[in-house]
């Protein structure tokens, strides 16, 4: 089950973070923040290959005892980070990839909104509803 979904700007500040157990919210914020170092490492290691292959999915960034952290980066260097419960062994890599594609499509809809200023926090009800449904769907 996805317990935290975050959208991080190109400059590494959060545009949107949603986590389900609210008592562990600070822990998830920390995990998302620390995963940005791994994202930057993977992007710099891939370099031109990332641009040439158009592979946006970064895969597993790092596992912890209770959670696994996955990453995805857009062409505009906006990063999506998803924290998944490690106990859910039925969740496959292609399912995570498809969740990131859904998230990317929804983020694109937010960006196309003429009333949204790029770089501001995402406060779209449609985006929030989609993230909530993704977190429930994976359970």
Swiss-Prot record:
Q: What Pfam families does the record point to?
A: Sedlin_N (PF04628)
Known SUPFAM superfamilies for this protein?
SNARE-like (SSF64356)
User: Would you name any one GO CC term?
Assistant: TRAPPIII protein complex
- Keywords from the UniProt entry: Cytoplasm, Endoplasmic reticulum, ER-Golgi transport, Golgi apparatus, Transport
Major localization listed first in the record, in broad terms: cytoplasm
GO terms in the biological process aspect are: COPII vesicle coating; endoplasmic reticulum to Golgi vesicle-mediated transport; vesicle coating; vesicle tethering
InterPro entries assigned to the protein according to its UniProt record, in alphabetical order: Longin-like_dom_sf, Sedlin, TRAPPC2L
Record's subcellular location: Cytoplasm, Perinuclear region; Endoplasmic reticulum; Golgi apparatus
Coiled coil feature spans: none
As for family, the record states: Belongs to the TRAPP small subunits family. Sedlin subfamily.
Protein's job: May play a role in vesicular transport from endoplasmic reticulum to Golgi.
Q: Extract the PANTHER family matched here.
A: TRAFFICKING PROTEIN PARTICLE COMPLEX SUBUNIT 2
Its quaternary structure?
Answer: Component of the multisubunit TRAPP (transport protein particle) complex, which includes at least TRAPPC2, TRAPPC2L, TRAPPC3, TRAPPC3L, TRAPPC4, TRAPPC5, TRAPPC8, TRAPPC9, TRAPPC10, TRAPPC11 and TRAPPC12. Interacts with the heterodimer TRAPPC3-TRAPPC6A.
Q: What is this protein called?
A: Trafficking protein particle complex subunit 2-like protein
Please give the organism.
Mus musculus
**Which lineage?**
Eukaryota, Metazoa, Chordata, Craniata, Vertebrata
